[in-house]
Amino acid sequence: MKLPARVFFTLGSRLPCGLAPRRFFSYGTKILYQNTEALQSKFFSPLQKAMLPPNSFQGKVAFITGGGTGLGKGMTTLLSSLGAQCVIASRKMDVLKATAEQISSQTGNKVHAIQCDVRDPDMVQNTVSELIKVAGHPNIVINNAAGNFISPTERLSPNAWKTITDIVLNGTAFVTLEIGKQLIKAQKGAAFLSITTIYAETGSGFVVPSASAKAGVEAMSKSLAAEWGKYGMRFNVIQPGPIKTKGAFSRLDPTGTFEKEMIGRIPCGRLGTVEELANLAAFLCSDYASWINGAVIKFDGGEEVLISGEFNDLRKVTKEQWDTIEELIRKTKGS
């Protein structure tokens, strides 16, 4: 193979979503670059069935915030199908009632609905009292209530910042502390699970209030895992990557522009599913995971490790291009 006099390696910084991919190798006027489709997804087909045995949560009480839609609805559906008595909470009572009736009919187990704005500590206190009254002390607590939207940070008002942090951080704290105190009084344990995001750890522009608040949720969960284990309570976190739900995508990708970009940076080649997340959540809240405490589980198809590695975009280089590169490297050895 005839080689050019020079090859320029231009490993630049990542371009914003929606822009043309950067050039990796310049071969004269020809760009050595390979577009890749997410064909690898065929190796990672999602399973839709329940992972745990039937009746794994028989006799258990589960409390799920944000349980009326999306991920919360998916987790509630699975827990109820496995025998749990579920209580769901959110601000929209009409949505909650419809979800509770649908899941109850589907699984044959009663699902209770309680209206609650987690930003209001008095309302949270009343909700927990009603929860205990209708179902008993919870064995499972899933903090799933969330709020988020994309915006340049310099455009955020104090109220916009407060709205997100009040729901995500303060709301999770109010629910966790109120239920925790009641469990301590009753000398009962429970498994707590919080749903955050991978950028709670890495940080991310344009969702700064959410990233900050969810990082706080993770710190709180790990701290309570250390402090309240003596009371029989476990605290774990799931960091989901992109999972297509109507609510989240309507705010974070309203035009559908970025979905292909998202898939392109996931090694498994597809978005996650609600059912997969529900299976992971159910496992972490089950007795099968009784020795898992203080864990933060990434659930992102490998997205974070791909975008974090400086040279991971070399996956787009073809075998023929690698042959060229290898020959060039051999020629320059010792120079």
Swiss-Prot record:
Effect upon mutating K214A: Reduces enzyme activity by over 99%
Annotated catalysed reactions: a (2E,4E)-dienoyl-CoA + NADPH + H(+) = a 4,5-saturated-(3E)-enoyl-CoA + NADP(+); a (2E,4Z)-dienoyl-CoA + NADPH + H(+) = a 4,5-saturated-(3E)-enoyl-CoA + NADP(+); (2E,4E)-hexadienoyl-CoA + NADPH + H(+) = (3E)-hexenoyl-CoA + NADP(+)
Residue numbers annotated as active site: Y199 (proton acceptor)
Modified residues (Phosphothreonine): T69
Protein name: 2,4-dienoyl-CoA reductase [(3E)-enoyl-CoA-producing], mitochondrial
Residues the record lists as binding NADP(+): G66, G67, G68, T69, G70, L71, R91, D117, K214, P240, G241, P242, I243
Keyword Phosphoprotein: yes
Annotated gene: DECR1
Gene3D superfamilies found in the cross-reference section: NAD(P)-binding Rossmann-like Domain
Top-level lineage group: Eukaryota
Function as written in the Swiss-Prot or TrEMBL entry: Auxiliary enzyme of beta-oxidation. It participates in the metabolism of unsaturated fatty enoyl-CoA esters having double bonds in both even- and odd-numbered positions in mitochondria. Catalyzes the NADP-dependent reduction of 2,4-dienoyl-CoA to yield trans-3-enoyl-CoA.
